[in-house]
Amino acid sequence: MNKVQNIIDQLKDLTLLEAADLVKQIEETFNVSATAAAAPINMVAATAGAGSAEAVEEKTEFDLILEDVPADKKIAVLKVVRGLTGLGLKEAKDLVEAAPKPIKEGMSKADAEAGKKQLEEAGAKATLK
């Protein structure tokens, strides 16, 4: 183990140019390629990274869902629903009474969050999907 530790200590003291020269000499002496050994590792990392990048991709369209409306808050929620959807009084009332129900679909994140906040301030429970 002492030999290995000595080699590690010597490698730590190498400059960048000396390390590059060492790699070149190892390639020639042992007939190996440092790039060929590193390429599969990089390819695996790149493919794993690409998969996670797709999973991390942020959603751009949201659906605002009215989950629950307490009976004593129906009128306030009804006003918010009408403002968000542009529905008439009867249509908005039917929508509020049919909860859980989507209020609006395909909204931007900012609009959906603002609508959710308005509904919650009026007393309703809302979610984004």
From Swiss-Prot:
CDD domains: Ribosomal_L7_L12
Protein family (similarity comment): Belongs to the bacterial ribosomal protein bL12 family.
Region annotated Disordered, chain positions: 101-129
Keyword Plastid: yes
Function: Forms part of the ribosomal stalk which helps the ribosome interact with GTP-bound translation factors. Is thus essential for accurate translation.
Listed InterPro entries: Ribosomal_bL12, Ribosomal_bL12_C, Ribosomal_bL12_C/ClpS-like, Ribosomal_bL12_oligo, Ribosomal_bL12_oligo_N_sf
Biased composition (Basic and acidic residues): 101-123
Record flagged with keyword Ribosomal protein: yes
Name of the protein this chain belongs to: Large ribosomal subunit protein bL12c
GO CC terms of this entry: chloroplast; cytosolic large ribosomal subunit
Compartment(s): Plastid, Chloroplast
Quaternary organization: Homodimer. Part of the ribosomal stalk of the 50S ribosomal subunit. Forms a multimeric L10(L12)X complex, where L10 forms an elongated spine to which 2 to 4 L12 dimers bind in a sequential fashion. Binds GTP-bound translation factors.
PANTHER family on file: 39S RIBOSOMAL PROTEIN L12, LARGE RIBOSOMAL SUBUNIT PROTEIN BL12M
Pfam families for this protein: Ribosomal_L12, Ribosomal_L12_N
Coiled coil spans: none
Gene source species: Guillardia theta (Cryptophyte)
An example Gene Ontology molecular-function term: structural constituent of ribosome
Keywords, in A-Z order: Chloroplast, Plastid, Ribonucleoprotein, Ribosomal protein
GO biological process terms, semicolon-separated: translation
